[in-house]
Amino acid sequence: MSIKIEKIDHIGIAVKNLEEKLALWETVFGVKAEKIEDLPERGVKLACLKFPHSPTVELVSPLNDQAAVAKFLAERGEGIHHFCFNVENIESAFEELKKKGVQFVQDKPYQGAGGSRIVFIHPRSLGGVLIELKEDRPKK
């Protein structure tokens, strides 16, 4: 059995100053942020930029020094932080990958931005790449 990946949802880019980098991306590419959201429980603020026929670009900055993205920025500087795949069912994907020996950053999926359910695969499981799995909130 394998998990059902629907698409690459977004590419997360870690930035130190969200407002500054968002203005730069908007100027360079002529797009506006579709969404800007604070996630204080995760210690991050993010802005999502939509491009035609492409994954979203998610700019992510820390709200505090304890946020995982703050540690990433201190160790590696700004740049690509993660790739996100949409999955059909986050719970079954999580359980299936655990059976295959995949290590996760969290103990279980949790609520992400916009009411989605997410979980991160630890970089040591996939050659140093942080992968987010995301199940979108059901559309009403």
Language model regions located:
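Short, structured motif recognition centered on aromatic/hydrophobic residues
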Residues: 8-15, 25, 49, 54-60, ...
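Conserved acetyl-CoA-binding loop of GNAT-fold acetyltransferases
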Residues: 27-33, 101-103
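Serine-centered coil/turn micro-motif
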Residues: 66-68, 112
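Conserved active-site tyrosine of GNAT-family acetyltransferases
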Residues: 21-26, 97
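Mid-chain, well-packed structural core segment of small domains
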Residues: 72-100
